[in-house]
Amino acid sequence: MTDTAEAVPKFEEMFASRFTENDKEYQEYLKRPPESPPIVEEWNSRAGGNQRNRGNRLQDNRQFRGRDNRWGWPSDNRSNQWHGRSWGNNYPQHRQEPYYPQQYGHYGYNQRPPYGYY
């Protein structure tokens, strides 16, 4: 096995004229006409191949409408689901004073103070 120190000068000598005017193979490659890019049809279609050129794209999302014609999940009636009842706990939903762990300082972990503060 050859040493790296010996191999580097050999490779530099072998490829000294690579990608230059003296490289005949590269010059032939440059003379070729450019290849056309691949054509990918219907790359953003959701339903498969039989949905070509649908005019109104808004109709694709009809099944996601809720009961009162709002956008959301099917039959999304979360607003009137509980009818004012609590979720099963009697704990207050908001604390009187906000709880911030003080181990990271005023601006939190990995946050910077506002520009010009330093």
From Swiss-Prot:
Family to which this protein belongs: Belongs to the RAM family.
The keyword Nucleus is annotated on this UniProt entry: yes
Entry superkingdom: Eukaryota
Gene name of this polypeptide: RAMAC
Gene Ontology biological process: 7-methylguanosine mRNA capping; RNA 5'-cap (guanine-N7)-methylation
Ranges of biased composition (kind: Low complexity): 45-56, 98-109
Residues with N-acetylthreonine modification: 2
Sequence ranges of Basic and acidic residues compositional bias: 57-70
Positions carrying Phosphoserine: 36, 86
Full protein name: RNA guanine-N7 methyltransferase activating subunit
Coiled-coil features, chain-numbered ranges: none
Annotated stretches, region: RNA-binding: 56-118
